[in-house]
């Protein structure tokens, strides 16, 4: 009977470790992306120029605000 208890405890510990690791990794990535956003104003300016648009500061600010708003809603 002791072997079954040991096996059950090992399985429970593995599941708890997987869940804990997932939650810690998720929190770390959210914090990382908040501190280091994947796109910045300079990248937006370059993208708009490549698409043939003249990037005004107003357009860039609007796009950054929209992206930040969407990112905050997803979190």
From Swiss-Prot:
Keywords: Membrane, Transmembrane, Transmembrane helix. One of its GO terms (cellular component) is plasma membrane. InterPro entries: UPF0154. The chain crosses the membrane at residues 3-23. Signal peptide: none annotated. It comes from the Bacteria. It is a single-pass membrane protein. Pfam families: UPF0154 (PF03672). It is found in: Membrane. Belongs to the UPF0154 family. This is UPF0154 protein SERP0914. It comes from Staphylococcus epidermidis (strain ATCC 35984 / DSM 28319 / BCRC 17069 / CCUG 31568 / BM 3577 / RP62A).
């Amino acid at each position: 009977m002791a072997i079954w208890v040991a096996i059950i405890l090992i399985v429970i510990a593995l599941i708890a470790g997987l869940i804990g690791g997932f939650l810690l990794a998720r929190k770390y990535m959210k914090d990382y992306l908040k501190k280091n956003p994947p796109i910045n104003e300079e990248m937006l300016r370059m993208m708009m120029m490549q698409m043939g648009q003249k990037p005004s500061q107003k357009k860039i600010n609007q796009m950054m605000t929209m992206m930040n708003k969407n990112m905050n809603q997803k979190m």
